[in-house]
Structures are given as C-alpha cells and as structure tokens.
Amino acid sequence: MLLWLFEHLSGYNSSFQVIRYLTLRSLLSILTSLAIGLMLGPVMIRKLQALKYGQAVSSFAPENHAKKMGTPTMGGVLILMSIGISTLLWADLSNPYVWIVLGVMVVFGAVGWADDWIKIRYKDNAGLPARKKFFWTSVASLGAGISLYVIAQNQPNPIHTANMLDLLIPFFKNLSIPLSAVPLGIAFIIFTYLVINGASNAVNLTDGLDGLAIMPIVMVAAGLGVFAYLAGDIRFANYLHIPYVKYTSELVVICSAMVGAGLAFLWYNAHPAQIFMGDVGALALGAMLGTIAVMVRQEIVFAIMGGVFVMEAISVFLQIGSLRMRNKRVFLMAPLHHHYEKQGWKETQVVTRFWIITIMLVVLGLMTLKLR
C-alpha cells in the first residue's frame, strides 16, 4: 500500500524512491509488526480476561500446568493482525504470492479461532468438528497448491536454475524429485497440501509450553526469509543452484512481519505467560511457514530448520501408534516436551533447550546453500 503511495510521490520528489529497496521495507515490516504487538498486547490481554477467554488445562497435563488455568488464550489474533497490517503496509500488493500467503493465514486463522471459541464457549475440548476443520484447511491448502502450479506454468525456468515445481534435495547439486513429471501438477498440488497441513498441525502440537512454539517460528521465518530473498534474485539462484522463483522476494516482507510479531508476542508469552496464542495462532503460523517453504522450493530444508516441530509431531504419531498396536507407551507423555517434563525437566529448561536446538537446525538449513 505504502509502496504504491511512495512510488506515486516519487514523481514529485525522487527521494521517495528509497521505498523500493526490499531491505528497507523488510526492516520497516519488522518494526511495524513489533510495535503493533507490543502496544496492543496489554489491551488484548485485558480484553480476553474480561471476556473470560481463559485456557483450560487437561486432566492429563503435567501437574505443574494447573497454574496455567485461566490464562488468556486466542492471543494469536494479535499476531495475525500485526502480520497482516505490516504486510499490507510494506509489501508489493501486486505480487500474487503475498495474497496467497495472506489467504492461507486468514483461512487457517479462522479455523483455529472457531476451534478455540468452541472449546471456551462450550467447555468442549474437542473444539471444531474434525470434518469441518479438514474441509476448510483442505480448501485453503489445495487452493494454494493450484494457484502456485498455475503461476509456475506461466513462468519459464531460466537456464541453469532448478525446476520450480520439483522437490529439491539439499546437500546435492542439481538433484531433485521430479514432481513436475506428473501431468496437471497433481503430485505438486498434493505435496503442497501435505506440507501446509503438516506444518500447521506440527506447530500446533508444539505450542504447549510458555514461549516454546513462538521462538522457533520466529527463527524459521527468518531462515525462510533468507531463502526467499535468494530465490527471488536470478543471480543468486544461478550461483547457488536453487530455483529462481520470480515472486518470492516480497515474501521477505512477510517473513519480517512474522519475526516482529513473534518477538512482540514472546514479550507477553515468556514464562510465566500472560497470554497464549491458541489454535488461531498456531494453525495459521504453521500453515504460513509451510506455504512459504513450498514457494521458495525448500520443503526439506524447512523440515530441517523446523526440526523441533517435526520431532513433536513424530512423537505424537509414535505414541498413538504404539498404544493402538502394542498397548505400550513410547514416551512418558506426548508431545515430546511433556515427556521431558515428566522426566523432571523444568518448563524453562525444556523451552530454552528446544530454542538452542532450533538455532542449530536453522544454521544447518542455511548451510545447505553452500554445502553441495
């Protein structure tokens, strides 16, 4: 929005052309979302307390979680609002990728909000019926996959860059799984669906301790922002042997907004948390990360950088599978962070150590750019 305004004003004063610089707009995006989150955080907390939108604690949760009862939830609304406003202000709104990511954010956020509201309003831990949740998240993720396929079909691949529809294998030059070989983009669309929904649910499973999910979200968003910047510049794409994807540069602005909004939320979500993001935040932010990973064609690297999310999801699958097949537990409790709590780790220890793991994994993900 402001990009259009400043470009119009540059006709009267050339100094306004400075807004065209992506790095400047990305920095402003971080600062804007950070400021919105910090300023509106106390207002959101008081409003949620007045509405009695408090967190319910499961009887199966570790004993030390009882003190979290009644802590305001649905704080993800503030995160998404901060990201949305910052993106609309500083991103190039003629870029289709911007609208796809925002669309995914809105739909998954709405599903998460409905899920949270039903749990609070009706004291029903089941939340939104699974069929409705599956339908709307499928509409959003399949819609994103189809849109990306159509855009890719109208964008020729420059010489020396990888195919933007194939699954890139990190650590190897020019090695990929040819999703583009399947007619009509069926393999690509299905894969996109799995990545977006898998990321959304994995982040949601991780969001169980104060600050546990939001900091890895911030770090992974920053890492994906680097890939978005490089994939959107044909010179870097050629040099690094990654796909050149015309529209990804503007995703840096969105990733920056996610970083700023996430840090602002952490201010109030740090232990002891004053607010939780709820499903409205976790489902939407996870889906956004998955969508951006598909756009920059770095799904495997995304799984590496978001290894904490992957471990949390796998721990749940293993626990459920083992209980059904062997009637035995693999972990003391799932997701994984509760297992360590049961082993005697303090909540802050679990969170800090998972943050350290994420830092190392994000660095490893970035190293794949050169280690080939």
Swiss-Prot record:
<feature type="transmembrane region" description="Helical">
    <location>
        <begin position="134"/>
        <end position="154"/>
    </location>
</feature>
<dbReference type="GO" id="GO:0046872">
    <property type="term" value="F:metal ion binding"/>
</dbReference>
<protein>
    <recommendedName>
        <fullName>Phospho-N-acetylmuramoyl-pentapeptide-transferase</fullName>
        <ecNumber>2.7.8.13</ecNumber>
    </recommendedName>
</protein>
<feature type="transmembrane region" description="Helical">
    <location>
        <begin position="98"/>
        <end position="118"/>
    </location>
</feature>
<keyword id="KW-0131">Cell cycle</keyword>
<comment type="function">
    <text>Catalyzes the initial step of the lipid cycle reactions in the biosynthesis of the cell wall peptidoglycan: transfers peptidoglycan precursor phospho-MurNAc-pentapeptide from UDP-MurNAc-pentapeptide onto the lipid carrier undecaprenyl phosphate, yielding undecaprenyl-pyrophosphoryl-MurNAc-pentapeptide, known as lipid I.</text>
</comment>
<feature type="transmembrane region" description="Helical">
    <location>
        <begin position="275"/>
        <end position="295"/>
    </location>
</feature>
<keyword id="KW-0812">Transmembrane</keyword>
<feature type="transmembrane region" description="Helical">
    <location>
        <begin position="211"/>
        <end position="231"/>
    </location>
</feature>
<feature type="transmembrane region" description="Helical">
    <location>
        <begin position="300"/>
        <end position="320"/>
    </location>
</feature>
<dbReference type="GO" id="GO:0005886">
    <property type="term" value="C:plasma membrane"/>
</dbReference>
<keyword id="KW-0132">Cell division</keyword>
<comment type="similarity">
    <text>Belongs to the glycosyltransferase 4 family. MraY subfamily.</text>
</comment>
<keyword id="KW-0479">Metal-binding</keyword>
<keyword id="KW-0997">Cell inner membrane</keyword>
<dbReference type="InterPro" id="IPR018480">
    <property type="entry name" value="PNAcMuramoyl-5peptid_Trfase_CS"/>
</dbReference>
<keyword id="KW-0961">Cell wall biogenesis/degradation</keyword>
<feature type="transmembrane region" description="Helical">
    <location>
        <begin position="73"/>
        <end position="93"/>
    </location>
</feature>
<feature type="transmembrane region" description="Helical">
    <location>
        <begin position="25"/>
        <end position="45"/>
    </location>
</feature>
<dbReference type="GO" id="GO:0051301">
    <property type="term" value="P:cell division"/>
</dbReference>
<dbReference type="GO" id="GO:0051992">
    <property type="term" value="F:UDP-N-acetylmuramoyl-L-alanyl-D-glutamyl-meso-2,6-diaminopimelyl-D-alanyl-D-alanine:undecaprenyl-phosphate transferase activity"/>
</dbReference>
<dbReference type="InterPro" id="IPR003524">
    <property type="entry name" value="PNAcMuramoyl-5peptid_Trfase"/>
</dbReference>
<feature type="transmembrane region" description="Helical">
    <location>
        <begin position="251"/>
        <end position="271"/>
    </location>
</feature>
<keyword id="KW-1003">Cell membrane</keyword>
<feature type="transmembrane region" description="Helical">
    <location>
        <begin position="176"/>
        <end position="196"/>
    </location>
</feature>
<feature type="transmembrane region" description="Helical">
    <location>
        <begin position="349"/>
        <end position="369"/>
    </location>
</feature>
<keyword id="KW-0460">Magnesium</keyword>
<dbReference type="GO" id="GO:0008360">
    <property type="term" value="P:regulation of cell shape"/>
</dbReference>
<keyword id="KW-1133">Transmembrane helix</keyword>
<keyword id="KW-0573">Peptidoglycan synthesis</keyword>
<dbReference type="GO" id="GO:0071555">
    <property type="term" value="P:cell wall organization"/>
</dbReference>
<dbReference type="Pfam" id="PF00953">
    <property type="entry name" value="Glycos_transf_4"/>
</dbReference>
<keyword id="KW-0133">Cell shape</keyword>
<keyword id="KW-0472">Membrane</keyword>
<dbReference type="GO" id="GO:0009252">
    <property type="term" value="P:peptidoglycan biosynthetic process"/>
</dbReference>
<keyword id="KW-0808">Transferase</keyword>
<dbReference type="InterPro" id="IPR000715">
    <property type="entry name" value="Glycosyl_transferase_4"/>
</dbReference>
<comment type="pathway">
    <text>Cell wall biogenesis; peptidoglycan biosynthesis.</text>
</comment>
<dbReference type="GO" id="GO:0008963">
    <property type="term" value="F:phospho-N-acetylmuramoyl-pentapeptide-transferase activity"/>
</dbReference>
